[in-house]
Design a protein with these regions (language model features):
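Helix-loop-helix connectors at the membrane interface of multi-pass transporters/channels
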Residues: 54, 58, 64, 88-111, ...
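Hydrophobic alpha-helical segments and their helix-loop junctions in multi-pass secondary transporters
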Residues: 85, 89-98, 146-174, 255-260, ...
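Membrane-water interface regions at transmembrane-helix termini and the short interhelical loops
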Residues: 13-18, 43-45, 60, 68, ...
């Protein structure tokens, strides 16, 4: 599951926020080492008792209380389903654009909307047909993406001056090419990308208009690095460059009125913020990892599998994304501003000149994305919805509900706010993991009453409602502590560290609350 398109794109926003490619990969690697440790620990009951997360979680949250964290985890998975479905839709959109002989664009347009709808329908077909119907595809998804990544690295290296020259291009991506000058709201900065010589701009003219439509009739002017432009309203800016076959145009860029003076966090907190976001990438899987580890042969096998398979794979596949994007800056003449850098493989492949190569490669993307999306983002939420109301919601109905929610979250917007989403997810799911681990290791010392996990009146019912008040209270307070920085600026750093804030707070509070709500049962080990 580490080999997927979101992993390919992980380093993109880190680099565009000012980090170097080495710093981005180090943060990804370190964050994955950190999150792998609790994933290994939380996978322990899966191996020992052979139980999935919705059953294991009953010990801490109650026989019915587990539905709350399961639903939170399910809603997050619905979001990821929507994002991956949008990516799959982009691949279909690229195929349609190629068949119609028009340039591919990754924004919201007719082809991409049609592609999204088609990919969603294909996904729902396999949900209704049952996950067994797609198992034959799951064996090919990771190898297909790995093979594609290797081929693109070879292509990028052979088509340019070598790996060093390619990676040097990351410096061009660390700020926007079209932006307001910091501290001067009337000064528009134009910094088109440059060729491999480091001197020749890839664009020579620019146009400014008050709307996207009016760019067609706008006057084109020679580019200077600084342009006096009164910032009295939103504007649209576009760059272009003459070529033997006509003009290459950048995508139109919208600039609103300049923001207030820069209040961005210091460099140290930028690293911490991205570190938290990268931990949040696996926040959902860290909670439900026992769904997978229950199939492991031993604790040693699940430990080795996670530590060997996760951090290194994430770093390597993220590196592929960085390298291929940087190579695209040198190879494709229509990539003339940093904002147009093709960070996702769909956009890279769509720029190849051979229609058959584009169609074949995008079909490979479809297969890989489809199998990964259903395995990682449909099974868990569909099961959670079904467990909540088993009389009314079957597994298939839960899968369709997952698909509907995946549309409602508007993934075409979320995909551009991935860092903010990951930090929010961290604040929601970190507390759940903290409670699970505090209960299993700190209180029960890994001892569970297996039969009791299936008894509505057993040791994990706690009360007539089947809800453990200690867990729910610790969860609410942990989430509130992690997310309070969203509304109170003075506590912003608590939000920047949302996974750690929520995890530690909820674990400690649960340990304090447990004996208070279980005075008659404090001596039991299960």
């Amino acid at each position: 599951m580490a080999v997927c398109i979101p992993t390919w794109m992980l380093a993109s926003q880190m680099i565009t926020s000012g980090l170097s490619w080495i710093e981005a990969l180090l943060i990804i690697g370190l964050a994955n080492i950190v999150i792998t440790l609790p994933m290994v620990l939380n996978g322990h009951p899966g191996v020992k008792y052979g139980i999935p997360f919705p059953v294991f979680g009953r010990a801490a949250f109650g026989i019915y209380g587990i539905h709350l964290p399961a639903l939170v985890r399910a809603l997050v998975a619905c979001g990821w389903f929507g994002i991956q479905t949008w990516i799959g839709g982009l691949a279909i959109g690229a195929i349609l654009a190629t068949l119609w002989g028009i340039p591919y664009q990754s924004d919201i347009n007719t082809f991409n909307v049609i592609g999204f709808a088609l990919f969603w329908l294909i996904s729902m077909y396999f949900v209704v047909a049952g996950t067994e119907s797609i198992k034959w595809l799951e064996e090919f998804s990771a190898p297909v993406l790995i093979l594609m990544g290797v081929l693109l690295i070879v292509w990028g290296t052979l088509s340019t001056g070598g790996m060093k020259e390619v990676l040097d291009q990351t410096t061009q991506l660390r700020q926007k090419s079209i932006r307001w000058e910091t501290g001067n709201p009337d000064l528009l900065m134009l910094s088109p990308l440059v060729e491999a010589d480091g001197l020749t701009p890839k664009a020579s003219e620019f146009a400014i208009a008050d709307s996207k439509e009016n760019l067609v009739a706008a006057t084109w002017q020679s580019i200077q690095s600084q342009v006096e432009q009164p910032a009295n309203g939103p504007i649209w800016v576009q760059l272009r460059q003459k070529s033997p076959n006509g003009w290459h145009y950048s995508s139109p860029q919208f600039l609103d009125k300049p923001a207030a003076p820069n209040t961005n966090p210091t460099s140290v907190w930028i690293y911490i913020l991205w570190f938290t976001a990268m931990v949040g990438f696996w926040a959902t899987m860290s909670i439900s990892i026992s769904d997978i580890t229950r199939l492991a042969k031993s604790q040693k096998a699940q430990i080795a599998g996670q530590f060997i398979g996760l951090p290194g794979t994430m770093m390597l596949f993220s590196f592929v994304g960085v390298f291929v994007t940087c190579a695209s800056l040198l190879i494709f003449p229509d990539v003339m501003i940093a904002e147009d850098a093709p960070w996702d493989p769909v956009s890279v492949l769509a720029r190849f000149s051979s229609p058959w190569v584009v169609i074949a490669a995008q079909c490979m993307m479809l297969v890989a994305t489809l199998s990964t999306n259903i395995a990682a983002n449909v099974i868990a939420p569909a099961t959670a919805f079904s467990n909540l109301l088993p009389k009314w919601i079957s597994y298939r109905t839960g899968g369709i509900l997952t698909g509907i929610i995946g549309i409602l979250i508007c993934p075409w917007w979320l995909i551009h706010e991935i860092s903010s989403i990951l930090i929010l997810i961290s604040g929601l799911l970190g507390p759940v993991l903290g409670i699970l681990m505090a209960d299993y290791f700190w209180i029960r010392k890994t001892n569970l009453h297996l039969a009791g996990l299936y008894q509505t009146q057993g040791p994990y019912a706690y009360n007539a409602f089947g809800i453990h008040p200690a867990a729910w209270l610790a969860l609410f307070l942990g989430v509130a502590t992690a997310l309070v920085g969203l509304w109170i600026p003075e506590l912003r750093h608590a939000y920047d560290l949302s996974w750690f804030t929520g995890f530690i707070t909820s674990a400690i509070l649960y340990r304090i609350f447990f004996p208070l709500f279980n005075k008659k049962n404090t001596s039991k080990t299960y």
